[in-house]
């Protein structure tokens, strides 16, 4: 298929997803949050954060105004969660959430029974427009969470410094990295069982040959921190090359893809 036709199809797919999400009605909680914080206080704390990336349900019908995949809609985060195939029962499991931002997926892992959850983020986008760990800290307080947080980069990871984790979440980070293979080696070093990875990818070169496109001038979402578009074959190949076994694609649409790989 010609690249120009593929680009048109992908543009249409993204518009369809936006339309479907606009009609989707997720069940939200009207109960108090685990902290027991009253509604007025929750609303005040949510308003203190000028930018929420994740949609987090705080009870009382209050859901933060998330911004997922360019879709500013309260169901965006849950839509991604449904495609990750994260196990419903995480009792006894340790989970690492790389690039956790507001912490939705960290708190979800805790909710599913994970015995330890560590969220890391270096908030490299702070200088552009955002607010560091403020959203995470407020969410943790409202949810009365025990999720740990460390300000760190994926390049900082090592078993000696952070320990090992049964499940590693690596969501929306890979294509922002100048040194993607080094990052995957670091991720592999702290993974005990399984990696779940979501990223932008290059759908235009859907061949068996591993290929990667370098974005020099903010071609993706006009974001100067995006650098790479690996095609599907290349993503599977680099996961194997750093040591992961049986990498597989579990979901993709438009220019986004979700993969699982095993230790």
Model regions: which residues?
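Conserved alpha-helix/loop element of class I SAM-dependent methyltransferases that forms part
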Residues: 70-93
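Short alpha-helix
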Residues: 225-243
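Short, glycine-/aromatic-enriched active-site segment of Class I SAM-dependent methyltransferases
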Residues: 202-226
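Class I SAM-dependent methyltransferase SAM/SAH-binding core
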Residues: 104-151, 156
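Membrane-proximal basic amphipathic "stem/tether" segments
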Residues: 1-49
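Conserved beta-strand signature within the Rossmann-like core of class I S-adenosyl-L-methionine
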Residues: 192-204
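A short SAM/SAH-binding and catalytic strip from SAM-dependent methyltransferases
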Residues: 166-179
């Amino acid at each position: 298929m010609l690249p120009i036709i593929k680009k048109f199809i992908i543009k249409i797919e993204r518009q369809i997803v936006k339309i479907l999400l606009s009609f989707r009605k997720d069940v939200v909680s009207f109960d108090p949050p685990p902290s027991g914080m009253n509604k007025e206080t929750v609303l005040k704390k949510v308003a203190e954060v000028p930018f929420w990336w994740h949609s987090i349900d705080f009870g009382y019908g209050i859901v933060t105004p998330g911004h997922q995949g360019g879709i500013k809609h309260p169901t965006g985060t849950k839509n991604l969660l449904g495609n990750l195939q994260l196990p419903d029962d995480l009792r006894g499991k340790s989970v690492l959430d790389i690039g956790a931002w507001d912490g939705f997926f960290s708190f979800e892992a805790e909710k599913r029974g994970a015995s330890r959850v560590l969220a890391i983020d270096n908030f490299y986008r702070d200088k552009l427009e955002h607010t560091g760990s403020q959203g995470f800290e407020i969410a943790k307080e409202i949810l009365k969470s025990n999720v740990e947080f460390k300000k760190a980069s994926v390049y900082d990871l090592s078993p000696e410094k952070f320990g090992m984790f049964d499940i590693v979440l690596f969501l929306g980070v890979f294509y922002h990295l100048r040194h993607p293979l080094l990052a995957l080696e670091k991720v592999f070093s702290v993974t005990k069982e399984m990696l779940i990875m979501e990223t932008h990818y290059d759908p235009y070169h859907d061949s068996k040959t591993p290929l990667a496109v370098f974005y020099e001038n903010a071609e993706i979402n006009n974001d100067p921190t995006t650098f790479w578009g690996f095609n599907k074959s290349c993503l599977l190949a680099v996961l194997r090359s750093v040591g992961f076994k049986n990498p597989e694609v579990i979901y993709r649409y438009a220019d986004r893809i979700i993969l699982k790989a095993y230790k």
